Amino acid sequence: MLMTPTGQNYGTLEGAYNHFNKALFGGALPNCLITVQRHKGAYGYFSSDRFGRVGSSTETTDEIAMNPMHFNGRSIEQTLSTLVHEMVHLWQHRFGKSSRTAYHNKQWADKMREVGLIPSDTGAPGGKETGQKMSHYIATEGAFERACNVW
């Protein structure tokens, strides 16, 4: 039986989330809802407690959204690095101290470096590591690159 486009895309994203959660976060991150949504000017985003859980009036789940407009124009490693970038936001929300909405603080930047992504407002070496609108680049031979190579 052929896999549907929905099953293939969401299954791949969920498999990647599970792999990087184990490899980079020691399996500490909770399950979340991964969505595919267009969001102008962003490769992805994180939203805490975004959706109610089916069958519960009080429980919520966090969302990691990936922008499909950028899937074809970037390498699989770059796309997966966006997923991990958003996973760092989830980590900070659950285990750290977030700053104001959309601000990427020093704690976030330190965790990014720990998982093998270098924060940069330009997406290249030499950029600011904290701020409102942030990107990153992949650390050569860092934890993310090693985990990506075995995925």
Label every model-predicted segment.
Residues 2-74, 94-151:
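Metalloprotease/metallohydrolase-associated module, dominated by Zn2+-dependent proteases
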Residues 78:
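Glycine-rich, basic loop-to-helix element that forms the pyrophosphate-binding segment
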Residues 81-94:
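Active-site recognition of the HExxH zinc-binding catalytic motif
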